[in-house]
Swiss-Prot record:
GO terms for cellular component: chloroplast; small ribosomal subunit. One of its GO terms (biological process) is ribosomal small subunit biogenesis. It comes from Diphyscium foliosum (Nut-moss). Part of the 30S ribosomal subunit. Contacts protein S5. The interaction surface between S4 and S5 is involved in control of translational fidelity. One of the primary rRNA binding proteins, it binds directly to 16S rRNA where it nucleates assembly of the body of the 30S subunit. With S5 and S12 plays an important role in translational accuracy. Gene3D superfamilies: Ribosomal Protein S4 Delta 41, Chain A, domain 1, RNA-binding S4 domain. SMART domains: Ribosomal_S4, S4. The lineage of its organism: Eukaryota, Viridiplantae, Streptophyta, Embryophyta, Bryophyta. This is Small ribosomal subunit protein uS4c. Its main location: plastid. Belongs to the universal ribosomal protein uS4 family. NCBIfam families: PRK05327.1, rpsD_bact. Keywords: Chloroplast, Plastid, Ribonucleoprotein, Ribosomal protein, RNA-binding, rRNA-binding. The gene is rps4.
Length: 202
């Protein structure tokens, strides 16, 4: 399944606020779920599916990519759900978004693809690049690159930078301090339901 490129408002009407996808927050339609015994299995599946879709659309990844992350998380020590969130949060495109250097994760991905971003003084053009503690992120020394980031930062001022990251606004430099904890996730999600959804596939 390819990455979603359709109307973003339609997605957040169905799934709720997804700040990585869009800053818009339209009113949600009331959606009553039939709680009868005959529909119980269907509704439980739907709940798990929607939690999985939240992760996909928020982080802007394909179904295949998400399944790959789930498989990696299953092999790691600790809670599978928490490790999954950490893997997604440490992607370079998401780090740029959380630092306020891009208004959305698709916007951050574009910065990386267009070679505006350096990690540890080296250009990285892979949005899925996995950042690690003590990595520092800077902007290419070009007027165009600098101008794009400054404009993005003005748009992103309403978001608070999480504790596992630091941003020096004068030097336009971000630092990954540590692996984030569960409380720093910028998305309302029940990751255990996502793990359950993939229990037969991963």
């Amino acid at each position: 399944m390819s990455r979603y490129r359709g109307p973003r408002v339609r997605i957040i009407r169905r799934l709720g606020a997804l700040p990585g996808l869009t800053s818009k927050t339209p009113q949600l339609k009331s959606n009553s779920i039939n709680q009868s015994a005959s529909n119980k299995k269907i509704s439980q599946y739907r709940i798990r599916l929607e939690e999985k879709q939240k992760l996909r659309f928020h982080y802007g990844i394909t179904e295949r990519q998400l399944l790959k992350y789930v498989r990696i998380a299953r092999k790691a020590k600790g809670s599978t759900g928490q490790v999954l969130l950490q893997l997604l949060e440490m992607r370079l495109d998401n780090i740029l978004f959380r630092l306020g250097m891009a208004p959305t994760i698709p916007g951050a991905r574009q910065l990386v693809n267009h070679r505006h971003i350096l990690v540890n003084d080296r250009i990285v053009n892979i949005p899925s690049y996995r950042c690690k503690p003590q990595d520092f992120i800077t902007i290419k020394e070009r007027q165009k690159s600098q101008g794009i980031i400054v404009k993005n930062m003005d748009l992103s001022q309403k978001y608070k930078i999480p504790n596992h990251l630091t941003f020096n606004s004068l030097e336009k430099k971000g630092l990954v301090n540590q692996i984030l904890d569960r409380e720093s996730i910028g998305l309302k999600i029940n990751e255990l339901l996502v793990v359950e959804y993939y229990s037969r596939q991963a």
